[in-house]
């Protein structure tokens, strides 16, 4: 039977979006680029098969699922596995299948803790287990470039920014030759431009997801701040500690003057 995990609070142990994708891709040998792609439920089903062999009817899991009713079917298989192994967790299927970042990110944070509590380190071949199937990729815009970010994602579990910088450094050597080739008019320049555009599209999606993640946590902090302000006159020491944490700044940090950023930009 499974070891249940009930903690859902945000802690320092929680992984960032990039680290979470790196863990999933490395563990299951997938090419996921967005947390939202977990909405199909297929990855969770395979993780359950890894943790508890035989708990999931993996042959029935649709790794190429692209429609909501297919996602729901996968989550039904996952629910059956949870029930079989005594996992005391309600899966918010109706929210997850919508493919929203916030809902999927919260659930995968819990699932990572559940995985860590139950994984015994045994060998597992994810590709053979799913008979070579790959998960369907929703954003067709970046489909040709999916193989490129896989290496930086799986090689970095400590630096969320590393996938971005790796792609930039990889593109730099090609930019020079690309400019030189324009003069002779060789067709290779078009291929190189297309490749660079693919990398730009991947970076744009990465920035978009980072902004969503930022707004998600900022919204939580803003709600906490409002609650503290509503109860400001109660002289609650716990409340005061929360306020102190909310407004704390790094040592040596100075709020810039209104003209500060403008002057810096001009010098730049």
From Swiss-Prot:
Residues 185-268 are annotated as: Interaction with CDK5RAP2. Residues 208-268 are annotated as: DCTN1-binding. Gene3D superfamilies: 1.20.5.1430, Calponin-like domain (1.10.418.10). One of its GO terms (molecular function) is protein serine/threonine kinase binding. The modification N6-crotonyllysine is found at residue 66. The modification Phosphotyrosine is found at residue 124. Residues 232-255 are annotated as: Interaction with SKA1. InterPro entries: CH_dom, CH_dom_sf, EB1_C, EB1_C_sf, MAPRE. The modification N6-acetyllysine is found at residue 220. Residues 146-187 are annotated as: Disordered. Residues 206-211 are annotated as: Interaction with APC. Residues 153-169 have a biased composition (Polar residues). Residues 14-116 form the Calponin-homology (CH) domain. Ubiquitously expressed. Keywords: Acetylation, Cell cycle, Cell division, Cytoplasm, Cytoskeleton, Golgi apparatus, Microtubule, Mitosis, Phosphoprotein. Residues 220-242 are annotated as: APC-binding. It is found in: Cytoplasm, Cytoskeleton; Cytoplasm, Cytoskeleton, Microtubule organizing center, Centrosome; Golgi apparatus; Cytoplasm, Cytoskeleton, Spindle. Residues 124-268 are annotated as: Interaction with MTUS2/TIP150. Residues 185-255 form the EB1 C-terminal domain. Homodimer. Heterodimer with MAPRE3. Interacts with DCTN1, DCTN2, TERF1 and dynein intermediate chain. Interaction with DIAPH1 and DIAPH2. Interacts (via C-terminal residues 206-211) with APC (via C-terminal residues 2674-2843); the interaction inhibits association with and bundling of F-actin. Interacts with CLASP2, DST, KIF2C and STIM1; probably required for their targeting to the growing microtubule plus ends. Interacts with MTUS2; interaction is direct and probably targets MTUS2 to microtubules. Plus-end tracking protein (+TIP) that binds to the plus-end of microtubules and regulates the dynamics of the microtubule cytoskeleton. Recruits other +TIP proteins to microtubules by binding to a conserved Ser-X-Leu-Pro (SXLP) motif in their polypeptide chains. Promotes cytoplasmic microtubule nucleation and elongation. Involved in mitotic spindle positioning by stabilizing microtubules and promoting dynamic connection between astral microtubules and the cortex during mitotic chromosome segregation. Belongs to the MAPRE family. This is Microtubule-associated protein RP/EB family member 1. It comes from Homo sapiens (Human). The gene is MAPRE1.
């Amino acid at each position: 039977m499974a070891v249940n995990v009930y903690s859902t609070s945000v802690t320092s142990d929680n992984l960032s979006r990039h680290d979470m994708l790196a863990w999933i891709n490395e563990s299951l040998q997938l090419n996921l680029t967005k947390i939202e792609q977990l909405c199909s439920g297929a990855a969770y089903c395979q993780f359950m098969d890894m943790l508890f062999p035989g708990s999931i009817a993996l042959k029935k899991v649709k790794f190429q699922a692209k429609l909501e009713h297919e996602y729901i079917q996968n989550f039904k298989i996952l629910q059956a596995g949870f029930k079989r192994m005594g996992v005391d967790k309600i899966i918010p299927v109706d929210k997850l299948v919508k493919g929203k970042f916030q809902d999927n990110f919260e659930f995968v944070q819990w699932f990572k803790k559940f995985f860590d509590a139950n994984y015994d380190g045994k060998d597992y071949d994810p590709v053979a287990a799913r008979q070579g199937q790959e998960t369907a990729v929703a954003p067709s815009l970046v489909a040709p470039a999916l193989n490129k970010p896989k290496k930086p994602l799986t090689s970095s579990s400590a630096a969320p920014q590393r996938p971005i910088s790796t792609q930039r450094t990889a593109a730099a050597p090609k930019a020079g030759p690309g400019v030189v080739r324009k003069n002779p008019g060789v067709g290779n320049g078009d291929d190189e431009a297309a490749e660079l555009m693919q990398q730009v599209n991947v970076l744009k999606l990465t920035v978009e997801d980072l902004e969503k993640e930022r707004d998600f946590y900022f919204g939580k902090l803003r709600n906490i701040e409002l609650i503290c302000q509503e109860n400001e006159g109660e002289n609650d020491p716990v409340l005061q500690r929360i306020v102190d944490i909310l407004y704390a700044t790094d040592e040596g940090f100075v709020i810039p003057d209104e003209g500060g950023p403008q002057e810096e930009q001009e010098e730049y």
